[in-house]
Design a protein with these regions (language model features):
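Active-site pocket-lining/capping segments in soluble small-molecule metabolic enzymes
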Residues: 1-150, 154, 160-303
Length: 303
């Protein structure tokens, strides 16, 4: 992977464990055929957590890939690996979990390039800062920071390298433009959220996942947003008022000094993740070539 330069958009991609097989096929192509891909962007990280991770949150990943396998892949291509440790309901007794601590030790030891962790719970933030200081920390979008003053306070915290605000602040351009460059460098925009722009249940949705990971009882969350029965649709995400596509990144965000962009997708199918890779990284004239390299051949039947 080329060294990112000033003004390069860095994409943070989903499914470190869940979509291992997709990335194992895509990354060699990404390295070998740079002419297929935009030269103004690069892969900043791949994020996720193993399926049995107590500290995980946001979404549930299902994968049988081991931490050593995923780290071998990311290190081969010089990509940062981020652990999604965004469970919002952690208590002090959870911090002693041996599997989660072993996971963090491994990611800290194999730290070239530097690996990180996406966090929500304050007690985990402080625990990681003390015990695994080589992991950089990202403030999770599961905090649902919809108030710009809250975002500014989070950006001012030195323990966070990046902060992912709620997607409904993506177009708060007047206030975003007024941030000092040191804070602009920390804002990581969630680009492709499909959630209803008027949703008031995001915290409840994320908390339900946190409870499941901890094995706690509690109410199941059923999304009541318009179109919820259809599940995630990229076409619907594209007309969301908070959507950030490649034109907006090139023409609006990069010129204003913003370079960090998160792509959601954990829990979706790998075919949809490939569509994200095509939209955000791949030049239109080479998208068919990428499909042919990865899966499309003369014998493929869809129906």
């Amino acid at each position: 992977m080329e060294t990112p330069h000033q003004g390069t958009a860095l994409f943070h991609l989903p499914g470190l464990f869940e979509f291992y097989d997709l990335y194992a096929a895509f990354l060699p192509l990404y390295r070998a055929h740079r002419e297929y891909f935009y030269d103004w962007c690069a892969i900043g990280s791949i994020y996720g957590a193993p399926s049995d991770c107590l500290w995980a949150g946001g979404r549930v990943e299902c994968s049988d890939r081991t931490p050593r396998e995923v780290l071998a892949l990311t290190r081969e291509y010089g990509i940062s690996a981020r652990l999604t440790l965004s469970n919002s309901l952690l208590r002090p007794e959870h911090l002693t979990d041996p599997d989660c601590n072993a996971l963090c030790r491994l990611f800290q030891e194999q730290n070239d390039p530097q690996n990180g962790a996406i966090v929500h719970a304050e007690l985990l933030t402080q625990y990681l800062k003390k015990n695994y200081p080589s992991l950089y920390l990202v403030s999770s979008t599961t905090k649902v920071l919809t108030d710009f003053n809250d975002l500014q306070r989070e950006l001012a915290r030195p323990e966070f390298r990046y902060v992912v605000p709620d997607f409904r602040l993506n177009r708060a351009f007047d206030r975003l433009a007024a941030l000092p460059q040191s804070q602009k460098d920390k804002v990581e925009f969630l680009c492709n959220e499909c959630c209803w722009f008027g949703c008031t249940e995001r915290r409840a949705c994320y908390e339900a996942v946190s409870r499941k990971n901890l094995g706690l009882s509690g109410p199941e969350h059923y999304c009541s947003a318009p179109g919820a029965a259809d599940g995630y649709r990229f076409s619907r995400a594209m007309v969301n008022p908070g959507f950030i596509g490649i034109k907006a990144i090139r023409d609006t965000y990069l010129p204003r000094g913003f370079t960090q962009f998160k792509i959601e997708g954990r829990g979706l199918g790998s075919a949809l993740i490939l569509e994200f890779l095509l939209h955000y990284l791949t030049k239109p004239e080479y998208q068919l070539a990428v499909r042919e390299e990865l899966y499309l051949d003369t014998m493929l039947d869809l129906f």
